[in-house]
Amino acid sequence: MDLRAGDSWGMLACLCTVLWHLPAVPALNRTGDPGPGPSIQKTYDLTRYLEHQLRSLAGTYLNYLGPPFNEPDFNPPRLGAETLPRATVDLEVWRSLNDKLRLTQNYEAYSHLLCYLRGLNRQAATAELRRSLAHFCTSLQGLLGSIAGVMAALGYPLPQPLPGTEPTWTPGPAHSDFLQKMDDFWLLKELQTWLWRSAKDFNRLKKKMQPPAAAVTLHLGAHGF
């Protein structure tokens, strides 16, 4: 079929109109369910915020403990903190964790750490320190709720503690002042490591759940061009 110049320009104008409106096309296919992505992003952002918040809290608390705990190169052995959940894990083991186990470990760790941190708050000697600890506990409780939201969005049940294993804090046997400070130091240290690991966990999960970029292909019969 012979296409004249006017017809060709008409088809070109039509094509330009279609291309102009392409950005609006994906909106027609949305179901209204954003999936777990926003919950995962929120949880990731919260872990980064808590990392920043903990740096301020730890500086204040370590100064309260005094030397050698507030010295930058102080790295004591872990003596009386065996009950704290450990964040450190072999890299290959960490990579092999499935999503459910990864989330479960985060939820259980913060349930225990929050309990111990509240105990720390109750024994803090100054009102300013108690306020700082209480504020951080509130933020950490928010992180727990956010992790629970991600698990619900992915269809995973919350871990149920076995009878008698619920995280509780009770004053242990009388420590020397130094050993008590050592326990407090390791609580903050382990919390710092968990927040660092959680940021890695949720960044990995965020990338995994990210939908592929929408691609639109136009099939044109370019007769006469």
Curated annotation (Swiss-Prot):
Organs and tissues of expression: Expressed predominantly in lymph nodes, spleen, peripheral blood lymphocytes, bone marrow, and fetal liver.
Pfam families attached to this UniProt entry: PRF (PF06875)
GO biological process: B cell differentiation; cell surface receptor signaling pathway; cell surface receptor signaling pathway via JAK-STAT; cell surface receptor signaling pathway via STAT; cytokine-mediated signaling pathway; negative regulation of neuron apoptotic process; positive regulation of astrocyte differentiation; positive regulation of B cell proliferation
Keyword Secreted carried by entry: yes
Superkingdom classification of source: Eukaryota
Keywords annotated in UniProt: Cytokine, Disease variant, Glycoprotein, Secreted, Signal
Subunit structure as annotated in this protein's UniProt entry: Forms a heteromeric complex with cardiotrophin-like cytokine CRLF1/CLF-1; the CRLF1-CLCF1 complex is a ligand for the ciliary neurotrophic factor receptor/CNTFR. The CRLF1-CLCF1 heterodimer binds SORL1 (via N-terminal ectodomain); within this complex, the interaction is mediated predominantly by the CRLF1 moiety. The tripartite signaling complex formed by CRLF1, CLCF1 and CNTFR also binds SORL1.
Disease: Crisponi/Cold-induced sweating syndrome 2: An autosomal recessive disorder characterized by profuse sweating induced by cool surroundings (temperatures of 7 to 18 degrees Celsius). Patients manifest, in the neonatal period, orofacial weakness with impaired sucking and swallowing, resulting in poor feeding. Affected infants show a tendency to startle, with contractions of the facial muscles in response to tactile stimuli or during crying, trismus, abundant salivation, and opisthotonus. These features are referred to as Crisponi syndrome and can result in early death in infancy.
Stated name of the protein: Cardiotrophin-like cytokine factor 1
